[in-house]
């Protein structure tokens, strides 16, 4: 099995991992696992995944170029179209992030 480049755990024990290399055609696969480690959903992205975070029943996927927001099983993933985020930390239906402008707070 591939070594994950990012991991996060959400409510109810859902585990998220990012595996793969964005330089390869297959890209990076983010997988959601239930508490028994059975895969319950996947999302493939073409960019390097910088970090994974959970907030309530959602997962935030920070890539080199954007922020993706998905449901717990990764069946619905949308692009927040926010670039320039270097680091982030979710908190109470929003998140703090570090950008070129400094530390900011944004709502989900």
Regions found by a protein language model. Name each.
Residues 1-12, 44-57, 82-94:
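Repeated scaffold domains used in trafficking and secretory/extracellular systems
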Residues 13-48:
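C-terminal structural cap/anchor segments
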Residues 11, 26, 55-56, 63-65, ...:
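Short loop/turn segments that connect beta-strands within the blades of beta-propeller domains
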Residues 16-18, 61, 97:
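Residue position within the beta-strands of beta-propeller blades
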Residues 1, 37-44, 74-81:
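A short beta-strand motif characteristic of beta-propeller blades
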Residues 24-31, 66-71, 102-108:
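Structural motif
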Residues 77, 81-108:
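Blade-level signature of beta-propeller repeat domains, shared across WD40, Kelch, NHL, RCC1
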